[in-house]
């Protein structure tokens, strides 16, 4: 019985495409019916993920119900508190609201699902807010930033610290052939996949003004370029740069995370 996780040193692996760093693996020790692993040194504050290997078969830790999904990979997680890791935790601060909303896209010919974060106090403040459009990477969906990336916890904590301005954050589904994340549309419990059609051929970028129009109509936004930002991870960065290029009057801030 072994454990593999991002708190272990990586190991070099040879492949037909060259050498790369593979996740580290360590043996678990059985003691009184409990399998244990002790790190050589205390772990630094951070959010860590791991899985277990039983005779080479990957399984999740049956004693840990806290898990994240990254495309088809499901891992157990834990947080060592302190420093940056406190941003990922639910702390005693005002909390925003996360909503799953459907909008119609004539360009893509379907109703589509997105995630919207509104900051603490939005419901009663009467204020208008800037909007940050946050796009996921390849294989992700509209759930990725909140479920995998803990975006709502990070935003709550940054805003409470005064390190971020209260804002609306919109997290779309960048897979233009799909309505929503696996299990969240009429397709049923489909398997997540990296190999989806219409992810980077321009359809998602072309339809994006429909998202902005929907958000401006249904939320108290500041409806101008200088109050909008767009950024994304990996494929989301690709989408961000091309959306900002295709619609230069839409966003004053553009970020590429990789």
Specify the residue positions occupied by each region the protein language model found.
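N-terminal cap/lid segment of alpha/beta-hydrolase-fold proteins
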Residues: 25-31, 40, 70-126
